[in-house]
Each structure stands twice: as C-alpha cells, then as structure tokens.
Amino acid sequence: MTTPLTAFGHDPWWLVLGKALAIFVFLMLNVLVAILLERKILGWMQLRPGPNRVGPWGVLQSLADGIKLALKETITPGGVDKFVYFAAPVISTIPAFTAFAFIPFGPVVSVFGHRTPLQLTDLPVAVLFILGLSAIGVYGIVLGGWASGSTYPLLGGVRSTAQVISYEVAMGLSFAAVFLYAGSMSTSQIVAAQDRVWFVFLLLPSFVIYLISMVGETNRAPFDLPEAEGELVAGFHTEYSSLKFAMFMLAEYVNMMTVSSLATALFFGGWHAPWPLNMWAGANTGWWPVLWFTAKMWTFLFIYFWLRASLPRLRYDQFMGLGWKLLIPASLVWVLIAAVIRTLQNQGYAHWTPILVISSIVFAAALVLSLRKPFTTPHIRALRRAAAPPGQAAAHRAGFHPGIPDTAAAGESAGGRE
C-alpha cells in the first residue's frame, strides 16, 4: 500500500495539530519507559534489582526523577554566557522532536471521517532533512559546552563535533544504497518499496554501517566520548542542573528513538508486519501497523541498552579510527557494488537478486570481521623485544620501564658482589 506525496498537506488544521500532539505524547511516554527499562535491564544484566522504590516494582521512578529535576533549584555558574547557556538545551531538544514529523507510523487511516496518513508530513528529500536536523542538534551540545566557561564541558563539545562529522558521513553513505533501490529519498516511499522484501536482507552492509553510526551519532556507550565521566566528569552538561539538564537528557533519548525509527523505516520495512504476521490479510491495514512499527523501534532501543551493559568505552583514537579507516571506506566500496548490481537490474538482467544477496552477505561478513582492526594496537613490549639485540633480551622482560631502575637486576648484582 503506497502513500503518495500528494496525500500530504491537505489535512485540516485540527488534524495536523492532533498529529503533532500525538507524536509529542508518544515520545514523552516512550522516554519515560525507556529510562526505566534501561535501568532495569542494566540491573538484571549486572545481577542487581535496579529501580524498585517508587511505585510497584519501581515503575514510577522515571516520573519521580522528572518531577525532582523540575523542582530543583536552577544554579547558574558564574562567568557563563547566559543567553547561549540557556539556549543550548533548547537547541538540542527542538530538532530531536522535529525529526519525528517525517517518520511514517502507518498507512492511510480514517480519523473522524478524514482519510489521512499516519505521518505528520513528508518531503521528496525527507531522509536528508532528518540527517540535517540531527546535525543541528549537535549545535546545542557544542554551544552548551562553550558557554559553560569550563574546560571539561568545552572538551565534551569539541569531541561531539568531531564525532558527528565522522559518523554522519558514514551514516549518509549507508543511505545511498537504500536510495538506489527504493528510487526515492522520501520516508513513506522507502517504506512502500519494502512491501515484499525488507532492505536489511538485500543491503545488509548498509544496515551494519548504519547500526554502528547511529550509536556514534547519539553519543551512547561504547561511543559516549563527549560525556565520559572518567575523563570529563559529565562532559558538555557538567555545569547544567534542574530542567536544563533534563532537556539534554530528553534530547538524547528522543534522538535514540529517531535513529531507531529511521532504521525501522529504511531497513526493516517500516510499519509493515513481520513474518508470519504478514500472512494475515489485515496486518498492514488500520491501526495495527503502529504496533509493528513501535515493536521494531523498541528492538533497536534494546540494542542500545545491551551495548551499554556489555561493552567498555573506546579510546578516542580507536573511535575516530573506526569511522575514518573502516566505516567510510567500506561505505564507498559497498555503494559502488550496489550501484553496479542496480545497473544490471535496470538493463534487464534476470539474476540480479541472488547476486545482490550473496554480495551483501559476503561484504557484511568481511566488514564485521574487520571491526577489530582499528582497535588493535601493537603491544609496546613486543615491539621492544623485537627491536632489542639478543644480549639485551632479558632487559625487556615484563615490568621493565625506560627511566625506572630495575630493582630486581640491582638486587642480583648486589648479591653477586657479596
């Protein structure tokens, strides 16, 4: 079922307002649930109960935290640029919510007698618009770090800038193959192109690259370098408290939902029902697709929680090397392969599908196997042993450091003299 672009822009004002309000409520409720579930899942994975004090089984903990932040005293550090300091959380939050206007939740439905798509609006370049909004949201992080007048927030903002520049390139290149096979950059048209086969099965390398890039784009573990507590206290929001801090956290979780929803729309069929539910004739009609879409989005949110509980934070050089040395070159090569196979399809070659699937699996496997390469650093002691003459091999045993006396060797010499 295709939703043409001409279906947008004809809703009455009250229906547009109702859609916008529904998206806002949907995001706010999902943020409350996501924060609670993240803390619960982390607790279960770390063999502890997690939040269990406010409400039955701790289900009201997120609401209590939000009320607490709203009622806390607003503390403004001395020496800050007040206008930029207060504007930064707003700049981060507004683009995060705006991006959801282009996410398709379902097909055309009837609302009080009006036929309308379950999407606020769409554009011929909607995916690029979402990519641009995510880049604008980073301005809030950079400005917040700069306006705080402190070293740690400034370093967090600079890290965030480098992170977005690096991983938005890889993310954009992962979209290119999707645009080639969907024939459109509109989110609703891309979802319609996956009516029979989801793009994750045809364009697996694009999905793997996007999956890694979306974690880096949202500053989440193991790529949470802009707010690394062991290095930068709390990063760009070190000097923020009360509602301003809550707005930064809200923007972070809404951005997680935005990139998760975009992954659902671009690679997992959007609101189309998964197998075997798609065998039911009514699975992709009415309001049921909203349920399928939400379930897919939450699958990606669970991956976020799982990664945070499982993987340690990367070093900054490892993180940047992953983007520039692996993801971007791999994206360029895969786009070239996908374009060649698309050309074969356009020229009427009958067996383009198995060629694309096999190429996709082989390239994705090679990409996953290459993920360790940017992280491996030659062991300095091994290099020292290899460079040392044979007679000095004993001097390079474990525990030896240049400029530090080898106490064991000194003791042996003293014993020999006695």
Swiss-Prot record:
The gene is nuoH. This is NADH-quinone oxidoreductase subunit H. It catalyses: a quinone + NADH + 5 H(+)(in) = a quinol + NAD(+) + 4 H(+)(out). The keyword Translocase applies. It is a multi-pass membrane protein. GO terms for biological process: aerobic respiration. Residues 394-418 are annotated as: Disordered. It is found in: Cell membrane. One of its GO terms (cellular component) is plasma membrane.
